[in-house]
Amino acid sequence: MLRSLWSGVNGMQAHQIALDIESNNIANVNTTGFKYSRASFVDMLSQVKLIATAPYKNGLAGQNDFSVGLGVGVDATTKIFSQGNIQNTDVKTDLAIQGDGFFIISPDRGITRNFTRDGEFLFDSQGSLVTTGGLVVQGWVRNGSDTGNKGSDTDALKVDNTGPLENIRIDPGMVMPARASNRISMRANLNAGRHADQTAAVFALDSSAKTPSDGINPVYDSGTNLAQVAEDMGSLYNEDGDALLLNENQGIWVSYKSAKMVKDILPSAENSTLELNGVKISFTNDSAVSRTSSLVAAKNAINAVKSQTGIEAYLDGKQLRLENTNELDGDEKLKNIVVTQAGTGAFANFLDGDKDVTAFKYSYTHSISPNADIGQFRTTEDLRALIQHDANIVKDPSLADNYQDSAASIGVTINQYGMFEINNKDNKNVIKENLNIFVSGYSSDSVTNNVLFKNAMKGLNTASLIEGGASASSSKFTHATHATSIDVIDSLGTKHAMRIEFYRSGGAEWNFRVIVPEPGELVGGSAARPNVFEGGRLHFNNDGSLAGMNPPLLQFDPKNGADAPQRINLAFGSSGSFDGLTSVDKISETYAIEQNGYQAGDLMDVRFDSDGVLLGAFSNGRTLALAQVALANFANDAGLQALGGNVFSQTGNSGQALIGAANTGRRGSISGSKLESSNVDLSRSLTNLIVVQRGFQANSKAVTTSDQILNTLLNLKQ
């Protein structure tokens, strides 16, 4: 009888423990990161009366044992580490673990390690990240000397998590020092089409000849100390933005005055012949052999082929006057007056080699060494020099072919508006006649007339270029251009507005210049303009991808005490790719331009990412990884010892803590501005209370029943 009594008592005690556990679960229904527990019931040792026996060979069956249980007990409380709900908060230092893992905290600044799922953290007055109970959160902290201004932007968002754990502490007055720009990257298109959407006047050139040092585009100072650059005429545009597209040998004629020749005509009864400008002219004299009839006949014969020679004949007293105004488009046969074969008969006074050359052909060539002796040009400087040279020779035939510029009375420049300008500046030399300029197109059987080029130069046409009078100017010549700007930072954190200007210099060639504000200087700048770097080169492939560029970097001296020279790499794209600059038939446009420098900044705000990295936002717009919260996981989470205050400690049955970063090694992710709620399910807990209550009541009934039977036994004695 006593066994039943004590079994009931044991049952009541076990259910009392279960009631305590479930009540504790319910009490912590709103405790952050709390994990509920349950009681594990086991039966007590049984009292064996008979053991079980096996069947006998004589046929007697086997028998089960005869044993009586001695009640129930609780051998363990099991913690259930299922995921709690994640709740949003307004606190940036609140953290929640989604998945396995525990935050690592220390009550003694790192000597002892405890663990928690409660991520309700805050910064104390010294900048330490702590729990509400004052335990310091551990992880990895960025080296104090590593301010992120040496590595890449990606490195700035990472913390070295391979070292030993530290207490997470962030200086609330942290300052990020300035980082000098050492790289400019750019994505843009430079228009390769026939029509330029963005143009600018070609660079001004003075009337002083300069010899290119590199055979391409020299940079030199004019009298006004403005940097000058000679440009490829084949890459230029007219003032409407239409590309000239000069092909090899295309060009113009420039006549500086009408060609003239006066000759006596001999009376003759014979046939007369003459070859002018390569065209044969012949006539048979009238039967009357007077000089007058010979003049008229000669004039009529020459004028009959004017469309082939450009020459018109006039009667001037008893002489024949030939004149070519050089106004017709065409080849050499229509220009000047040249006796290409001596005359006979009435033309006997026309000798082989007689000529009056006042019109000059200027033809474009792609060669970097054009032959000036035959009127070839490539750059604006080549054409300017040719026009100036020939204009002075025509005006003053006494000048030597290699005369000095100082001896010239006619100056040709390209003005600030991109126009070729001719000025008959000498008003003292009155014995020299004025010029009469006319521009016409050049064409031949193999070369077409470039009308755009001719029309742009026809602005030079003038009735008379008077000494000391007004100048004559062509239309405006432009180059395709594109410009963009970006602020670069020096080592002191000072901004400098750097402007990059691109201009087309050839079919697939672009040049660029870089300008920084004074007193800053660029290595390679001229003495007059040290803040301007000229001569950058870009070459594109026939698919519009970048083929190459030079130079690949700039050297900048801010002239304000900052480190110098500051080397800035120009990351304009990879060769053969479309990841930077391109040149296709599309408007010129900058899609993106970036540099990697920044000014000094104060720490303004913090936040955590999913890896537990503490990111600091600074007043300079930069973000820097300041620290990373560590996580620990265990082979057996249920083996951890609860210490109260939402804190656990490691035990022999939990296994060693496996420490690492979030999202690695079975460790979960971390959510900022969130907390993990208790995983207690009230409906389950309240149901369990009813079950425990019924169990307790049933066991109490066993006690009262046993008591009643004992009373019955006592009554039997009476």
From Swiss-Prot:
InterPro entries, per database record: Falgellar_hook_FlgE_sf, Flag_bb_rod_N, Flagellar_FlgE/F/G, Flagellin_hook_IN_motif, Flg_bb/hook_C_dom, FlgE/F/G-like, FlgE_D2, FlgE_epsilon
From the Swiss-Prot or TrEMBL record, state where the protein is found.
Bacterial flagellum basal body
Principal location class: other
* Listed Pfam families: Flagellin_IN, Flg_bb_rod, Flg_bbr_C, FlgE_D2, LlgE_F_G_D1
Q: Which UniProt keywords apply?
A: Bacterial flagellum
State any GO BP term from the record: bacterial-type flagellum-dependent swarming motility
Q: Which domain of life is it from?
A: Bacteria
Family, per entry? Belongs to the flagella basal body rod proteins family.
Q: Which PANTHER family match?
A: FLAGELLAR BASAL-BODY ROD PROTEIN FLGG, FLAGELLAR PROTEIN
Provide the protein name: Flagellar hook protein FlgE
Gene name on record?
flgE
